[in-house]
Structures are given as structure tokens and as C-alpha cells.
Amino acid sequence: MKNRLRLLRAERGWTQADLAERLDVSRQAVNALETEKHDPSLGLAYRIAAVFGLAVEDIFDNPFRP
């Protein structure tokens, strides 16, 4: 799923490890999300949104949105 994770993380000056710690996931999990190799669970998507102070829709593209 297309997302803005790398951009949002870079804007804050965070490393993948920094974001992983905030989300309580591995750095490898953050990398897999940023490179769109894996999609987040619904719970993780909401945690990511909370960490960035944004709505889920502002971070992840909805493939079903026209």
C-alpha cells in the first residue's frame, strides 16, 4: 500500500529505529512498510497515525478511493 511514512519520518529527523521504538515494532518492520513490501494491520495503521498526529487517510493511500 502506498504511504508517506519515509517522508513523514524524514521531516521529523527520525531514523527507522526511532520510529520503530515509538511504534513498538522492529526496524525491519518499519523498513518493510516504507518499501511497501508489507501492509500494516489496522491497529498498527492507527498507532502510526497517532505517532504522526495525522489521520490514517493522510498517511496511507486508499486503493478503493476513486
Across the structure, where does each feature detected by a protein language model lie?
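A structural preference for long, well-packed, hydrophobic secondary-structure segments
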Residues: 16, 29-30, 52
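Recognition helix of helix-turn-helix/homeodomain-like DNA-binding domains
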Residues: 25-39
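Short basic helix-loop element that most often maps to the first helix and adjoining turn
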Residues: 3-22
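Residue-level detection of the helix-turn-helix DNA-binding "recognition helix"
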Residues: 10, 24, 35, 64
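DNA major-groove recognition helix of helix-turn-helix/homeodomain DNA-binding modules
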Residues: 24, 43-58
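Short amphipathic recognition helices of helix-turn-helix/homeodomain-type DNA-binding modules
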Residues: 58-66
